[in-house]
Swiss-Prot record:
Protein's name according to its UniProt entry: Polyphosphoinositide phosphatase
Catalytic activity from the UniProt record: a 1,2-diacyl-sn-glycero-3-phospho-(1D-myo-inositol-3,5-bisphosphate) + H2O = a 1,2-diacyl-sn-glycero-3-phospho-(1D-myo-inositol-3-phosphate) + phosphate
GO molecular function, one term: phosphatidylinositol-3,5-bisphosphate 5-phosphatase activity
Species assigned in the record: Schizosaccharomyces pombe (strain 972 / ATCC 24843) (Fission yeast)
Job of this protein: The PI(3,5)P2 regulatory complex regulates both the synthesis and turnover of phosphatidylinositol 3,5-bisphosphate (PtdIns(3,5)P2).
EC number: 3.1.3.-
InterPro entries: Fig4-like (IPR043573), SAC_dom (IPR002013)
Reported cofactor(s): Mg(2+)
Length: 832
């Protein structure tokens, strides 16, 4: 499993057949280490034997090993069956075993130097097809499981555990790390391999079902990466009307955990621990959605689009509901905040029945808890509120702000920030946990995004406008997130989108909503039963009796067996929670201590092999991060040569700069319309000294004020020294001049003043050798964080430069050019 041991990930697989045996040859990312897995099926095909024939082989020994296998076999020859990128598992129905392989993949996200892949194509390999018992039941099962569309919304990673949150990864030492099988959809398929090679083996690759998306906020050239991960629970999974409410073991229908990760994309790797200062800083926030945890259902009919809701079982002790909330306490801690969005007033009671019963359940459970541990319940009829003049987003904003303050969010430490933990979770639901729930989760995500950006030093206050590029980008991500979850559970895309609740584009959103309503009704009427059968087969929730397949019986048998063995004990109805789960002080203490233990962990030399493959040629057009959906707006064309040689960041795609950089956090409606306006006088001006057909713009005018200042001769001289291949070629069309809004200028200053260590100059003589080295590295590699262009900064830089030379004379040649250019830069600024 990923991230559980020190074994190198296996990223490519070749399946060979030799008589009755199968050999899987795997290799690491650099194709330097190989491992071999042997699979043998019994004569009766009811059992299978798996062993690791060779653990570590180099290429030369691999060839010798394969030749030896062929020589030892009298009449056999190794036959290449297929190639794959992941082993998803082994399973059987009524006859022999099938091997499940991922044959095509695509990178969709990069987290901490770990690639996350989407499954594009899969293949079933029948072991021993010559003895195949092609019964009608076998054919039906195989046909059903192929209907589970693995070319959609299934994800895996070789080296990153997608089943766990980032906070868990940072606060649990790697030897104690455990995969959450609740979100591993191929868990039953991996069982034969797990039993043979162990859970820590890189042969076992967990598969999650849900949604993964990644985008980039360009903040004056600095990439801020936003990642959205949705994990769907495999327990009580299925179609909308066939999976409602809660199961007896506390798992609910349509249960999804959504994690919003925001980090500085300037560096790739994770910090060593959450409490150790590191670059970059990682932040995350987790939300939860799931069906109302009561025993309820809907009598589905092909005639009625909204079947009546009925409560199947009134438990006076709410035992299943108690198990559900105790599990939430165990995963996330306290407080557990319930945001219930079902309707409260209806002509014919449907959703309101669940509202009353849910309130009674929480009141009953809370009476046994301390005030600080109680479930915090918020009921709000979002459907009724959307019909009023006041936008529902305003009310949700207030709720979201209070929720985030109570739960906090996870953030790793840096030099000036100790780091924080998320303690507690918000559980959002409506009747389907689709449309209203997704809109509410977006508003909470928007509120958290502002807080995360503030922790990263991008914003000075946790406020974001809906019309800004950053929020629009986040809204698109949550829209895709909601569509994926709705398609998996309801059979259609979102019926009511965020635009519906914000009352934007009413005509287009209304027509779209009607179309999706029809699609959902059709899916629920004619397709859901087939989908439910396929999902049950895929998850292994069936039992074979001779040649008959019975669904659902396997789980009940396992539950009965646990009761018999004493592994499952009925809880006291008054003490329904686990005490250690609600001990917040102990949880935080343990998390901090476990995080400290990670400080001694050293990343292996092959840490980046999956992201930056050393034995293959790759281009920027093929790498994910430069091609992410982004708010990127570019600086003016005339600034490229200067920025490439200056200390300022550059957002450059290699094809030229298209437009001035705009602040992604300013509302678009407030942007000055004449920003790109070209005056008639400017059109008649002569070409500048560089023979470009556009007017040069001063760097200082762009950054600090709106008055044009001349570029220093030294800089112009340096521009002519740039190789022709690095210069931006002149264009036939003249580039317009522009004015930078003061808001952009102020935010730019704030952004690059954050975590500025140039203030250490006053106490340089008192600094330790370690801090001096840090400052020298800063001056050498990160001079883009200089607060202002002043003469004292040059003196400070020279002081550190001279001190560094005295400690390491070899640095003189490396720094002299930078100091000279820096001096010319300041001289030019003073002269203007």
């Amino acid at each position: 499993m990923p991230a559980t041991n020190s074994d190198e990930p296996l990223v490519k697989f070749e399946l060979y057949q030799l008589k009755k045996c199968y050999y899987i040859v795997s290799e690491n990312a650099t194709a330097t280490i190989f491992r071999i897995l042997k699979i043998t099926q019994s004569e009766d095909e009811l059992s299978i034997s798996i062993e690791e024939a060779a653990k570590i082989l180099f290429r030369q020994k691999l060839q010798l090993y394969l030749e030896k296998l062929e020589n030892e076999s009298a009449d056999g020859k190794l036959i290449l069956v297929t190639k794959a990128y992941a082993i998803l598992g082994l399973f059987r129905f009524t006859a022999g075993y099938y091997l499940y392989l991922c044959t095509e993949r695509k990178v969709v996200a990069v987290i901490g130097g770990h690639n996350v892949y989407h499954v594009d194509k899969t293949q079933f390999i029948e072991l021993n097809p010559s003895r195949r018992h092609n019964t009608s039941v076998e054919r039906k099962c195989m046909s059903s499981i192929e209907k589970v569309d693995l070319a959609r919304t299934f994800y895996f990673s070789y080296s990153y555990d997608l089943s766990q949150t980032i906070q868990y990864g940072f606060t649990h030492p790697i030897p104690q790390h455990q995969v959450r099988d609740m979100f591993v959809w191929n868990w039953n398929m991996l069982r034969p391999i797990l039993d043979s090679v162990g859970i820590d083996s890189p042969w076992c690759i967990p598969l999650i079902h849900g949604f993964v998306d990644q985008a980039k906020l360009s903040v004056y050239g600095k990439p801020i990466i936003v990642t959205l991960i949705a994990r769907r629970s495999r327990h009580f999974a299925g179609a909308r009307f066939l999976r409602r409410g809660i199961r007896d073991d506390g798992y609910v229908a349509n249960e999804v955990e959504t994690e919003q990760i925001v980090f500085d994309g300037s560096a790739s790797s994770f910090p060593i621990s959450s409490t150790t200062p590191g670059i970059p800083c990682y932040t995350s926030y987790v939300q939860h959605r799931g069906s109302i945890p009561l025993r309820w259902s809907q009598e589905f009919s092909n005639i009625t689009p909204k079947p009546p809701i009925g409560i199947d079982f009134h438990d006076p002790f709410y035992a299943s509901t108690a198990l559900h909330f105790d599990r939430l306490f165990g995963h996330y801690g306290i407080p557990c905040i319930v945001l219930n969005l079902v309707k409260s007033s209806e002509k014919v009671k449907r959703e309101s029945l669940l509202l009353d019963e849910f309130e009674s359940a929480i009141q009953y459970l809370n009476q046994f808890l301390k005030d600080s541990q109680k479930i915090q319940y918020i009921a709000w009829d979002m459907s009724a509120a959307s019909k009023k003049k006041v936008p529902v987003t305003k009310t949700l904003e207030q709720m979201a702000s209070d929720i985030v303050k109570k739960t906090g969010f996870f953030c790793t430490a840096d030099r000036f920030f100790p780091g924080t933990f998320q303690t507690g979770v918000v559980r959002t639901n409506c009747v389907d946990c689709l449309d209203r729930t997704n809109a509410a989760q977006f508003v909470i995500g928007k509120c958290v995004l502002a807080a995360q950006l503030r922790a990263l030093g991008v914003l000075d206050s946790p406020q974001l406008d809906y019309e800004s590029d950053a929020v629009r980008l986040l809204a698109e991500m949550y829209h895709g997130h909601g569509d994926a979850i709705a398609l998996q559970y309801g059979g259609s895309l979102l019926v009511n989108t965020l635009d519906t609740y914000r009352k934007n584009n009413q005509w287009s959103s209304t027509s779209r909503d009607l179309i999706e309503s029809v699609k959902r009704f059709y899916s629920n009427s004619f397709v859901d039963f087939q989908r439910q059968e396929a999902i049950s087969l895929f998850l292994g929730n069936f039992t074979v009796h001779g040649k008959i397949v019975v669904f659902g019986e396997k789980r009940l048998q396992a539950l009965t067996e646990k009761f018999k063995n004493g592994q499952l004990v009925r809880r006291d109805y008054r003490y329904w929670w686990t005490p250690v789960y609600v001990n917040q002080e102990l949880r935080c203490k343990n998390a901090y201590c476990d995080s400290i233990q990670r400080k001694g962990i050293k990343f292996p030399a092959n840490y980046f092999d999956n992201v930056y493959t050393p034995n293959s040629i790759s281009s920027f057009s093929e790498v994910l991060l430069p091609n992410l959906i982004s708010t990127l707006n570019f600086a003016p064309l005339s600034l490229i040569p200067l920025l490439r040689k200056s200390f300022l960041p550059l957002s450059y795609n290699g094809f030229g700069i298209e437009a001035p950089s705009l602040n992604p956090f300013i509302p678009r409606r407030n942007q000055p319309r004449d920003m790109f306006k070209t005056s008639a006088e400017e059109e008649n001006e002569d070409e500048d000294e560089d023979d470009d057909k556009f007017r040069r713009v001063s760097l200082y005018k762009w950054l600090f004020n709106n008055e044009e200042r001349p570029v220093h001769k030294f800089i112009r001289k340096r521009l002519h020294q740039i190789p022709v291949s690095n210069k931006v070629q002149p264009r036939d069309q003249k580039q317009p001049d522009f004015k930078i809004p003061n808001t952009d200028i102020n935010v730019y200053k704030i952004h690059f003043q954050y975590n500025n260590i140039s203030g250490l100059a006053d106490n340089y003589t008192l600094l330790s050798k370690h801090d001096r080295a840090m400052y020298n590295n800063y001056a050498d590699y990160s001079p883009d964080k200089i607060k202002e262009i002043k003469e004292k900064e040059l003196n400070t830089y020279n002081d550190y430069f001279n001190s560094a030379i005295s400690e390491n004379p070899t640095l003189k040649s490396d720094r002299s050019e930078k100091v000279a250019f820096y001096s010319a830069w300041i001289t030019d600024y003073k002269s203007t």
